[in-house]
Amino acid sequence: MEVNILAFIATALFVLIPTAFLIILYVKTESSSS
């Protein structure tokens, strides 16, 4: 089976961008509360 590189990159970005956004929000709330 041939791996579609563009599909893999699109999936990786689709997962990583919201995850990074949530981590940034979490860090901001943790630093502001403490």
Curated annotation (Swiss-Prot):
Membrane topology field: Single-pass membrane protein
Q: Name one GO biological process term.
A: photosynthesis, light reaction
User: Keywords, A to Z?
Assistant: Chloroplast, Membrane, Photosynthesis, Photosystem II, Plastid, Reaction center, Thylakoid, Transmembrane, Transmembrane helix
UniProt subcellular location = Plastid, Chloroplast thylakoid membrane
Q: Mind telling me which GO cellular component terms the entry cites?
A: chloroplast thylakoid membrane; photosystem II
Query: Where do transmembrane segments lie in this chain?
Result: 5-25
Against InterPro entries, the record matches this protein to: PSII_PsbM, PSII_PsbM_sf
Q: How does it assemble?
A: PSII is composed of 1 copy each of membrane proteins PsbA, PsbB, PsbC, PsbD, PsbE, PsbF, PsbH, PsbI, PsbJ, PsbK, PsbL, PsbM, PsbT, PsbX, PsbY, PsbZ, Psb30/Ycf12, at least 3 peripheral proteins of the oxygen-evolving complex and a large number of cofactors. It forms dimeric complexes.
Family membership, please give it: Belongs to the PsbM family.
What does this protein's UniProt record list under function?
A: One of the components of the core complex of photosystem II (PSII). PSII is a light-driven water:plastoquinone oxidoreductase that uses light energy to abstract electrons from H(2)O, generating O(2) and a proton gradient subsequently used for ATP formation. It consists of a core antenna complex that captures photons, and an electron transfer chain that converts photonic excitation into a charge separation. This subunit is found at the monomer-monomer interface.
The record's HAMAP family line, in alphabetical order, gives: PSII_PsbM
Name assigned to this protein? Photosystem II reaction center protein M
Species annotation: Zygnema circumcarinatum
Q: Which gene encodes it?
A: psbM
